[in-house]
Amino acid sequence: MSDNNTKPKGLSKSLKYFCGVGDCGFTLMSNIDTFYASYFFTNIARFSLGAITVMTTISAVIDAILSCFYGAFLNKIKPKKWGRYRSWLILTPWLVPFLYAMQFVKITNGLAGAIFITLAMITSRIAWNIPYIANVSMINIAGKTQEERMQLSSSRMVWTSFGTVIYSYVGPAAVAVFAGILGETNAYAATAFVFSALMAAGYYAHFRMTKGYEETGAEEMERLAREAAAKKKGGESQKISTFGAVKCNPHLLFLFLSNISKYIVLFMVNGLAIYYFTYVSKNPDLLTGFLFAANLLSIVASYCAKFIVAKINAKRT
């Protein structure tokens, strides 16, 4: 896995068309939690409603708190061998299949089982959030111009959308296949493991694609040493805090709140879907059609959104 010193010029064909395969795997993986976690806790593991509330609240609060520090962690920690961000595409993703599958392992419906699954939820999210942030950061590193960054972002969104569409059929089908082989109790853990492995493989593909685009750990340390010496001569530059950035750009706060609202509705509707089709409509097979239609409409809405935004901006100017 050693990197040579040759720096690629422009975006490679693999980056242009396959930047996002890891995000496709990430979408497949995370949707197992979105659609089946609550069902597993209540119907398979048979935890009480109070226990589920405590488990999910603890894991969600810790995840929210830690999410505020992942970026700072990556920026402050000593860069690893293959680069500050690129290295994390292979350092922790391989842990995710094991940690994530543990979230869907039934031990007991008592305290021990609740603690085991809660720890699995917390640790699995740490293991996948760090490479997720590093993966997004690599867009600004690999893309040297605004056009290149837009192309990488577009490719990533295409693969993410592709993941949501294929999950509509692959997700429920994988659970059904593993249920027939391993039983329903173990089907969700097996599906989580396989989809997490696909995510890890996709991130490894990103690692290979971005070879040469980011300076290695040794190269960055040399550069930082030179910059530190230059700062001593020229004086310290002014630093802008996160709160200062929000104060200068208040629209960022509204964007943040709108995204939170969007995901609250998304997770609530998707999480309740399996209950509706199982107990209300009495036809669980309809879940596949619902997922396909919802994900397809989300792609159409995302495509139309850029035209709506452009029209609104045109009216303002």
Over which residues does each language-model region extend?
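Membrane-embedded alpha-helical bundles of multi-pass transporters/translocases
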Residues: S2-A230, G234-T317
